[in-house]
Amino acid sequence: FAKMLADEYHSFVLTASRESEAQYNQEVSEHKQKLHSKKKSDAAFEEVPVKPSFKVVYIPANTSYAKILWHLEQNEGTGIICETEADTLGNVFKQEWGSYSDMLRKSFHHERLSSSRKGNNEFTEVNAPSLSIALSGTPNQVTGLISSSEDGLFSRFIFYAFKVEQKWKDVSPNANNINLTEH
């Protein structure tokens, strides 16, 4: 239910990002056409369109380390991971490309996140990230997410557990002795 509070805003931001990206792609295409049609003697220089940020409110848990860092950079350091099943994040942590426990620990303290890759001479840095995480799940899903309290991730989460009296609810067709086809 909590995720629904910002769903409409997320849709608005996502739509705006997609529209900005489409407009950018159109401008790039027009820019390329102008360059091809210009004469070599034409000295006028046209600026290349600037690519807009692609912002989202919710960042999916099923995302790689590099992509979450990219989302945070695009969002100016902010993001929300909200999943109804905690094992979505737990399963990602088991993948080589998705182990971002250190990113979550650093984000909790708003410490700088950075990454550098040889390909394309890529450098990404997010100062003072504000990343919120809201998960729901069973105790077994939590143990899949946080296998040990030793790495510090456990202490950065608040857990809320409650007991519910288990009552059997008979959902069979004859449960209430009402024939629904004749009723």
Predicted segments — roles?
Residues 1-183:
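Phosphate-handling catalytic cores of nucleic-acid transaction enzymes
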